[in-house]
Design a protein with these regions (language model features):
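N-terminal Rossmann-like NAD(P)+-binding domain of SDR-like oxidoreductases, especially those catalyzing
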Residues: 1-191, 231, 241, 323, ...
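Residue-level marker of alpha-helix boundaries and capping positions
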Residues: 8, 162-163, 196, 227, ...
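Residue-level signature of the cytosolic catalytic core of signaling kinases
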Residues: 41, 50, 145, 194-198, ...
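Residues at alpha-helix caps and immediate loop-helix transition turns in enzyme cores, especially N-
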Residues: 41-44, 94, 145, 197-201, ...
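A glycine/serine/threonine-rich, flexible loop-to-helix segment
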Residues: 48, 147, 198-206, 267
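Secondary-structure boundary/capping motif
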Residues: 90, 141, 193-197, 225, ...
């Protein structure tokens, strides 16, 4: 039976990955580590409570003793690192937190994995071990009107968030190049789907539209992102963990490029028709000052993972956005819970005064 350390398991992509893996593999043990910051919510894992294949540990990936103890107790076969501060706006206001979690936390995981997996006397790595870093296409910077990011595209991050993720990626490859650690990195485009914290575009807009709140759009709204349904991403991570060539980077994209303003108008139209609510219209859109250093376009070329592992995105945007809206409409209690308290202060600070 394979044993995984899943960090950031209570966040958006991490919790979806936990659900995906438990559904797919009857014989598996997932030790799920999460600090439970604002975006980490145990309600995301409510459906797997009591499953003996799922062990939850609250803690920080920067905690050396905690992580070392987990390696000693469980002898992990895989580490899948989702744990990260991930919102660009928050990184602009407080970059130090992003360095601590995204860079120092990654280095701690790498060091503890090296201590557990490397036999210094024999100068060999234990068989069947792998560290997988879940990263982002934002480490590449921005694109023009055409072209795509490839795995060979130089890293050129523009925000404190993407800089911290690029730094973490470089440490992962340094541990491979220096020590021979078995690693992979996946770099994905913009994810969407269930359990996403409503600071991100799609759940933010769904929630605001439902409550007739203004819809804050940065600049002209023509920033283009490649949208990837989260379950497709989970499938890709599983395939890279179990079949990816050691030391390789794999780009994971959805072939669903859309401008932000298109996304917002799609959500407006969907909810207007479903809820039969005349208060839902494009009049709710409010253009606000653009984000500092806002990248204009991202686009992923996933040819490598398609050719090497046979992965492809199964969910077109037109289907994925319907599934996503359905989920949020059917989980109003979840949304009410995560948007209480500190979220209101954050929202006021981010959008109301612009």
């Amino acid at each position: 039976m394979k044993t995984y350390l899943i960090t950031g398991c209570a966040g958006f992509i991490g919790s979806n990955f936990v659900h995906y893996m438990l559904k797919k593999y009857p014989e598996i043990l997932l030790v799920n580590l999460d600090k439970l910051t604002y975006a980490g919510n145990l309600e995301n894992l409510k459906d797997v409570e009591g499953d003996p294949r799922h062990v939850f540990v609250q803690g920080d990936i920067c905690d050396k003793e905690l992580v070392e103890g987990l390696f000693q107790k469980y002898d992990f076969d895989y580490v899948i690192n989702f744990a990260a501060e991930s919102h660009v706006d928050r990184s602009i206001k407080n970059p130090e937190i992003f360095v601590q979690s995204n860079v120092m936390g990654t280095v701690n995981l790498l060091q503890r994995a090296k201590e557990a997996w490397y036999d210094a006397d024999a100068k060999t790595w234990k068989e069947g071990k792998k560290y997988l870093q879940v990263s982002t296409d934002e480490v590449y910077g921005a694109l023009g009107a055409d072209g795509y990011f490839m795995e060979t595209t130089p890293l050129c991050p523009h925000s404190p968030y993407s800089s911290s993720k690029a730094s973490a990626d470089m440490f992962v490859m340094a541990f491979h190049d220096t020590y021979g650690m078995p690693v992979n990195i996946t770099r994905c485009s913009n994810n969407y789907g269930p359990y996403q914290f409503p600071e991100k575009l799609i759940p933010l807009m769904i929630n605001n539209v439902k409550h007739h709140k203004q819809l804050p759009i940065y600049g002209d709204g023509m920033q283009i992102r490649d949208w990837l349904y989260v379950e497709d991403h989970c499938k890709a991570i599983d395939m890279v963990a179990n079949g990816g060539k050691i030391g390789e980077v794999y780009n994971v994209g959805g072939h669903n490029e859309r401008p932000n303003i298109f996304i917002v108008k799609t959500i407006i139209n969907q909810l207007h028709d479903r809820l039969q609510d005349e208060g839902i219209s494009e009049d709710l859109i409010k253009h606000v000052a653009d984000r500092l250093g806002h990248d204009r376009r991202y686009g992923i070329d996933p040819t490598k993972i398609k050719n090497d592992l046979g992965w492809y995105p199964e969910t077109p945007f037109e289907k994925g956005i319907v599934l996503t809206i359905d989920w949020y409409l059917n989980h109003e209690e979840w949304m009410d819970h995560v948007t209480s308290g500190d979220y209101q202060n954050y929202y006021q600070d981010m959008y109301k005064n612009k």
